[in-house]
From Swiss-Prot:
This is 8-amino-7-oxononanoate synthase. Belongs to the class-II pyridoxal-phosphate-dependent aminotransferase family. BioF subfamily. Pathway: Cofactor biosynthesis; biotin biosynthesis. The lineage of its organism: Bacteria, Pseudomonadati, Pseudomonadota, Betaproteobacteria, Burkholderiales. Homodimer.
Length: 405
């Protein structure tokens, strides 16, 4: 008789170890008096961090902290129910109106988590017998939403509009949905949103964009990738749904989806991850209202971030020439330094950690085989000196790291 399948788990974990693919958590905390997004305590040690998604340095902003405290005083710390029962607080309702106005789309729906947003809205839009077209490098939440939908999934080559057009043309499905990251989370490049919409117009498809890494950073006043493409306000398309998270540049937590009143109403009626989950606490909505106001008002944060991006990319040029590592094209806060092998990426990460810098290595299956990398995340909180410290440490560590295979 064979043993329990539970007996296989230790061997499977050992396989992850052997392939340098086992994931480990680190306990982090903010450093008192230090800027959020750039400095943190990692396993009890102070670190200069290049891994936070706090792109504008707002997570510890005193205005947000005060707003959250005021929200807790007014509403308590929990919502007490799902949105369609008793959890849709006046704070959450006000945030939805503010978000819709900010991204210049008719209506917004506020969710408690980004992953649950995409995993829920995709199955609400398409199902069995429908066709779904997904970029090869989409985030896991879009991929899982596609799987849950039971629609026929067509995976097109990354950012390849020609491949997408051919697959759309070949489809006989009446209902079609194209899903894409707006800013790709592991590469940092921005999708051709106008090109995607043109194809959706041509083939009568809906377009769902995940702007987790563009909201607050790109576009006029940080209104996001869709606004940067000039496709909001009077130019908004009724076939576009715009999703963005609120735990990255906004510095808090949650997510929202915005679009036409009709599409958002449909999502409210049919998205299981919205209907059957406890609503986000009102205190977070209070903090987010303050965050969106700061995002809109403070262009200097985006300007500082743009300066750090330019400094990093220019400073890495000698390292790339010497090591053969690759810095992927990106004008966003996500800067992917592709090293290749898992072992080398881990060695570089460890060397940086020993020097007081925290830049975790990203390995398969999060990224394709052979493209293990440092995902360098920049923040407006980083200084020119911070970037120079990273460049110096990378130069030192790269000379000690195992050679490329």
């Amino acid at each position: 008789m064979s043993g329990s399948w539970l007996d296989e788990i230790p061997a499977r974990i050992a396989e992850l170890d052997a392939a340098h693919l086992r994931r480990r958590r680190r306990a982090t905390a903010p450093l008192q008096g230090a800027a959020s997004g750039a400095h943190m305590e990692v396993d009890g040690h102070p670190m200069l961090a290049f891994c936070s998604n706090d792109y504008l340095g707002l997570a510890g902003h005193p205005t947000l902290v005060r707003a959250a405290c005021a929200g807790a005083q007014a509403f308590g710390v929990g919502s007490g129910g799902s949105p369609l029962v008793s959890g849709h607080s006046t704070a959450n309702a006000a945030l939805e109106e503010q978000l819709a106005h900010f991204v210049q789309l008719p209506r917004a729906l506020y969710f408690y988590a980004g992953y649950a947003t995409n995993a829920g809205i995709v199955p609400a839009l398409v199902g069995a017998g429908d066709a779904l077209f997904s970029d090869a490098l989409n985030h896991a939440c879009l991929i899982d939403g596609a799987r849950l939908s039971r629609a026929h999934v067509h995976r097109y080559a990354h950012a390849d509009l020609g491949d997408l057009a051919a697959q759309l043309a070949a489809s006989t499905a009446r209902r079609k949905l194209v899903i894409s990251d707006a800013v790709f989370s592991m590469d940092g490049n921005v999708a051709d949103i106008r090109g995607l919409l043109a194809l959706c117009d041509q083939y009568d498809a809906l377009l769902l964009l995940d702007d987790a890494h563009g909201f607050g950073v790109l576009g006029p006043q940080g209104r996001g990738s869709l606004a940067e493409a000039g496709l909001t306000g009077a130019n908004a398309s009724p076939r576009v749904l715009y999703m963005a998270t609120l735990g990255k540049a906004a510095g808090v937590a949650g997510a929202f989806v915005a679009g036409s009143d009709m599409l958002v109403e449909w999502l409210l009626q049919k998205t299981r991850s919205y209907i059957f989950a406890t609503a986000a606490p009102p205190m977070l909505a209070s903090a987010l209202q303050a965050s969106v106001a700061l995002i809109e008002a403070e262009d200097e944060r985006r300007e500082a971030l743009a300066e750090r991006i330019a400094e990093l990319r220019a400073g890495l040029t000698p390292l790339l020439a010497r090591t053969g590592w690759q810095l992927l094209p990106s004008r966003t806060a996500v800067q992917a330094l592709v090293i290749g092998s898992n072992a080398t990426a881990l060695a570089v990460m460890e060397g940086l950690r020993e020097r007081g810098l925290w830049v975790p290595a990203i390995r398969p299956p999060t990224v394709p085989e052979g493209t293990a990398r440092l995902r360098i995340a920049l923040s407006a909180s980083h200084t020119r000196i911070d970037v120079q410290l990273l460049l110096t440490a990378l130069d030192e560590v790269s000379r000690l790291a195992p050679p490329l295979p």
